[in-house]
């Protein structure tokens, strides 16, 4: 059975240890890699702008509340770079299930059971839920996932709202949730199983066969169908009940003054909507944040491993910001809490400086041009963090289903 971490004190202690070690790795990398700060390269300094007085904040909050309480067409235009195919942030749409895998309660029941079953993995110890736990925002609270074998270590992204993503995984190697399920199961660095093993497990247990028969009547047990069942379940894991969503539904009091100021910062001065836009707060595209560990033991080329295009070196998919406060640590490295990420973005990140022997290296990573020093003050950063907190969903507790065993009768009673 899957062992869940829960909400106890052990998780923060473990996270602190992991993040301390991760920070040491980053510092060692930065200490041995020539860098240039963006403000230095521009010939200036990233000086924080003056903070507002309490009276000025109150006046600004009242002004913004009058603007943002209305239709989105009244909102001020966001600060967007030329060429960005931008969409306004807002409520989630309805989930569209593909024609090749229509929604059914029977498939969801089978998929949920498979999702929580560690016996699908080659070790018998890793379930999908091991890295995507409901009580941890459908992530796992770790800096990086614990793979079966050494691989580029990456943070486990939440699967909440994955139904709205066109490409899955940090490098976008899956083009559908069905592909994501199949690849997670068979990847030797993840669950490391085989289609035959999964099919054999389900075929050999009477209650699993009964669940399968309900989901796929009169069809033989296949790996493809089982992946469809898990994907069907994953498409039911959606949000849309955050305080931001309440605000969008017309509850003007759902956001505090600080959160409202943070919303305006998010769309404008902080430049967040260049990449984090649309209903899921992600453009679904790939960007280089300067965190690929170029030339180091932990180098991770990201999207390049999928496309082979040198322009994709160091690029990773923009993560959703919905539930971001519950799915820390953040970035594909899993090395940062929210405050650290905001501070890095405010500084414009750092830019690797090519050394002479790297001048013609086609695999030298190039940081996203959207990352620029912002000159935000600590008050601004606190307001931004406050707004991002409004994207948090109500805590979701889902009890794992009773897993079918050889001793069960064939009744499909495990939903």
Question: PLM features: residue spans?
Answer:
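Periplasmic c-type cytochrome electron-transfer domains
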Residues: 2, 6, 17, 29-415
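Short, Lys/Arg-rich N-terminal segment immediately upstream of the first membrane anchor
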Residues: 7-13
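Sec-dependent N-terminal signal peptides
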Residues: 16-25
């Amino acid at each position: 059975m899957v062992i869940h971490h829960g909400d106890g004190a052990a998780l923060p202690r473990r996270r602190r240890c992991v993040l301390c070690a991760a920070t040491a790795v980053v510092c060692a990398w930065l200490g041995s890699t020539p860098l240039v700060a963006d403000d230095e390269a521009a010939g200036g300094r990233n000086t924080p702008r003056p903070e507002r007085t309490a009276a000025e904040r109150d006046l600004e909050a009242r002004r913004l509340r009058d603007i943002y309480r209305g239709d989105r067409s009244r909102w001020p235009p966001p600060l967007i770079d030329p060429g960005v195919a931008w969409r306004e942030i807002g409520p989630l749409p309805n989930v569209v299930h593909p024609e090749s895998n229509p929604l059914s309660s029977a498939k969801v029941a089978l998929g949920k059971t498979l999702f929580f079953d560690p016996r699908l993995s080659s070790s018998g110890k890793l379930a999908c839920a091991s890295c995507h736990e409901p009580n941890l925002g459908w992530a796992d609270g770790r800096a990086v996932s614990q793979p079966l074998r050494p691989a580029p270590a990456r943070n486990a992204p939440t699967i909440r709202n994955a139904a709205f993503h066109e490409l899955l995984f940090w490098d976008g190697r899956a083009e559908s949730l069905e592909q994501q399920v199949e690849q997670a199961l068979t990847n030797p660095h993840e669950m490391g199983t085989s289609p035959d093993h999964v099919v054999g497990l389900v075929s050999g247990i009477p209650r699993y066969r009964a669940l399968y028969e309900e989901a796929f009547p009169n069809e033989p047990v296949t790996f493809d169908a089982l992946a469809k069942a898990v994907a069907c379940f994953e498409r039911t894991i959606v949000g849309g009940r955050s305080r931001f969503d309440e605000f969008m539904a017309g509850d003007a009091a759902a956001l505090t003054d600080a959160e409202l100021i943070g919303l305006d910062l998010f769309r404008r001065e902080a430049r967040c909507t260049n990449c984090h836009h649309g209903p899921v707060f992600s453009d679904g595209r790939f960007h280089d944040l300067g965190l690929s560990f170029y030339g180091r033991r932990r180098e991770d080329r990201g999207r390049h491993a999928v496309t082979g295009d040198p322009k994709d070196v160091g690029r990773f998919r923009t993560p959703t910001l919905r539930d971001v406060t519950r799915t820390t640590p953040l970035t594909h490295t899993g090395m940062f809490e929210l405050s650290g990420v905001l501070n890095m973005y405010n500084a414009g990140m750092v830019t690797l400086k090519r050394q002479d022997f790297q001048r013609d290296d086609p695999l030298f990573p190039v940081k996203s041009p959207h990352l620029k020093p912002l000159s935000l003050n600590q008050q601004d950063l606190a307001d931004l963090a406050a707004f991002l907190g409004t994207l948090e969903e109500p805590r979701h507790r889902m009890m794992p289903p009773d897993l079918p065993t050889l001793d069960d009768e064939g009744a499909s009673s495990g939903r």
